[in-house]
Amino acid sequence: MDPNCSCATGDSCACASTCKCKECKCTSCKKSCCSCCPVGCAKCAQGCICKGASDKCSCCA
């Protein structure tokens, strides 16, 4: 169980404007959680809730 999430890691969970679940998918907003979302990252900006800003983003490399 993720201490920051009400679901087991990998399971579905509800989210608001932020995602603290490491590997959870958000069901309430139908978006995935991005671990890093630097400003100007089009791939991260679409269809995901950002957990935090970072210059190192695997989905924007």
From Swiss-Prot:
**Annotated residues for binding of a divalent metal cation 6:** C37, C41, C44, C60
Q: What is known of its domains?
A: Class I metallothioneins contain 2 metal-binding domains: four divalent ions are chelated within cluster A of the alpha domain and are coordinated via cysteinyl thiolate bridges to 11 cysteine ligands. Cluster B, the corresponding region within the beta domain, can ligate three divalent ions to 9 cysteines.
Keywords annotated in UniProt:
Acetylation, Metal-binding, Metal-thiolate cluster, Phosphoprotein
Q: Name one Pfam family in it.
A: Metallothio
User: Which InterPro entries does the record cross-reference, listed alphabetically?
Assistant: Metalthion_dom_sf (IPR017854), Metalthion_dom_sf_vert (IPR023587), Metalthion_vert (IPR000006), Metalthion_vert_metal_BS (IPR018064)
Q: Which residues carry this modification: Phosphoserine?
A: S58
Binding residues for a divalent metal cation 4, per the UniProt record?
C33, C34, C44, C48
Family classification: Belongs to the metallothionein superfamily. Type 1 family.
Q: Where does a divalent metal cation 3 bind?
A: C15, C19, C24, C29
| Region annotation (Beta) ranges | 1-29
Report which superkingdom the organism of origin falls in. Answer: Eukaryota
Q: Where does a divalent metal cation 5 bind?
A: C34, C36, C37, C50
Region Alpha: what ranges?
Answer: 30-61
Q: Does the keyword ATP-binding apply?
A: no
Name assigned to this protein: Metallothionein-I, hippocampal
The organism is Bos taurus (Bovine)
Keyword Phosphoprotein applies: yes
Q: SUPFAM superfamilies, from UniProt?
A: Metallothionein
